[in-house]
């Protein structure tokens, strides 16, 4: 809609329309949008932003030729983050993670999901989820928590996978439910991590406590993660670098949102997920940052838009929908966010003057955000 107005009141969208229908009357604040793009703020439905330290040494290892899996096999990767988190002070974890949330909000993110998964022990997983609960209480935006104890098998259980899965199901899940610490259940269902039968057992256990699945699937191989996710009515299946006709057919007609994480493919040099094939097959897709210290150290949703175009061959308008409306669905927030609709939250991003909406994806390092509204205004620096 070109040459338009939008009215908000008390943090909600009231109405919008062409300028020749602008209602007369007093407004407390008028913002000039001439030559600018106004769009819904982003929802980031897949992040790992509670962590104890960055992993730039692994970045150098990968430049030297090691793969993500090889780094993990020598004790790096997720296990590296788990060792650091075990000794981390919860207050420091909270302060560092909340600083990341503030930076993400300044770049237009108005809702996000945060996963555990760098704990890999009862004490550390619960510590992470309690930190996420504190972020929920502090943040002026909706935050959802996912329990990802099945992110990797910790070294202490290297020769006892069943024992670790039993720990997750019999000890940690009941405590999570007792404290109300999670909204979703996640499993890394992929080669070298958790198998389909293991994922099946874990997701079934999560459902017993009301935790709907949102799972990692098909990042490294045709793992069967998509199919088992759909079988358990997962809210989303995420990554999806390895997708074929069987996976597409499994998703069509379901309530499961395929969620693509182009930042990970970019940073790890992976073959990107086949977004064009998914979209042309009739599937909607969501885009998310996968913000984490090992494989996607960025929470910039504007950059994700650009990667959606450059890596995934999505059209700019498709990336806008994927990062707003579809991503809100992947957080069960579609009634509150994702579109500029009367009654919804007035979570908005206003660009600087630009030549067209396509510019927002094209100029991939340009600081194009002029104003963010999340119930309050934040600087975009």
Where are these regions (language model features)?
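Metal-coordinating catalytic core of metallo-dependent amide/deamination hydrolases
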Residues: 79-96, 102, 110-223
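Divalent metal-coordination and catalytic microenvironments
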Residues: 6, 11, 35, 46, ...
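Metal-associated gating/positioning segment near the N- to mid-region
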Residues: 29, 33-96
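C-terminal cap of metal-dependent C-N hydrolases
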Residues: 325, 345-381
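Structural motif
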Residues: 107, 179-180, 209, 232, ...
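Conserved beta-strand scaffold positions in the cores of enzyme catalytic domains, especially
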Residues: 28-32, 145, 371
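Active-site-adjacent C-terminal substructures of enzyme catalytic domains
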Residues: 212-213, 222-339, 351-353, 378-379
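Histidine-rich, glycine-flanked metal-binding segment
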Residues: 1-39, 137
């Amino acid at each position: 809609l070109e040459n338009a107005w939008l009215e908000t009141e008390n943090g909600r969208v009231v109405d919008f329309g062409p300028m020749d229908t602008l209602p007369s009357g007093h407004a407390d604040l008028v913002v000039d949008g001439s030559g600018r793009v106004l769009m819904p703020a982003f929802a980031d439905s897949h992040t790992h932003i509670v962590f104890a330290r960055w992993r730039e040494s692994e970045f150098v290892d990968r430049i030297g030729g090691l793969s993500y899996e090889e780094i993990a096999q020598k004790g790096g990767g997720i296990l590296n983050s788990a060792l650091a988190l075990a000794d981390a002070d919860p207050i420091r974890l909270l302060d560092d993670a909340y600083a990341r949330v503030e930076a993400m909000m300044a770049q237009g993110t108005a809702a996000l999901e945060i996963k555990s998964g760098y704990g890999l022990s009862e004490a550390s997983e619960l510590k992470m989820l309690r930190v996420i609960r504190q972020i929920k209480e502090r943040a002026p935006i909706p935050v959802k928590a996912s329990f990802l104890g099945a992110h990797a098998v910790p070294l202490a259980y290297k020769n006892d996978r069943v024992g670790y899965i039993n720990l997750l199901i019999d000890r940690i899940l009941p405590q999570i439910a007792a404290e109300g610490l999670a909204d979703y259940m996640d499993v890394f269902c992929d080669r070298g991590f958790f198998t389909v039968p293991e994922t099946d057992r874990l997701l079934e256990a999560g459902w017993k406590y009301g935790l709907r699945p949102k799972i990692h699937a098909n990042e490294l191989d045709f793992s069967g993660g998509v199919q088992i996710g759909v079988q358990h009515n997962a809210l989303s299946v995420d990554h999806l670098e390895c997708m074929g006709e069987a996976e597409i057919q499994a998703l069509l007609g379901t309530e499961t949102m395929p969620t693509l994480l182009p930042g990970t493919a970019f940073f790890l040099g992976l073959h990107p997920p086949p977004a064009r094939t998914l979209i042309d097959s009739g599937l909607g897709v969501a885009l998310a940052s996968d913000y984490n210290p090992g494989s996607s150290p960025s929470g910039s949703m504007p950059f994700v838009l650009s990667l959606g175009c450059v890596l995934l061959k999505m059209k700019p308008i498709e990336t806008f929908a994927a990062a707003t409306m579809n991503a809100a669905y992947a957080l069960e927030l579609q009634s509150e966010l994702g579109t500029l609709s009367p009654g919804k939250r007035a979570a908005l991003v206003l660009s600087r003057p630009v030549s067209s909406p396509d510019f927002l994806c094209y100029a991939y390092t340009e600081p194009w955000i002029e104003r963010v509204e999340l119930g309050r205004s934040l600087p975009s620096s």
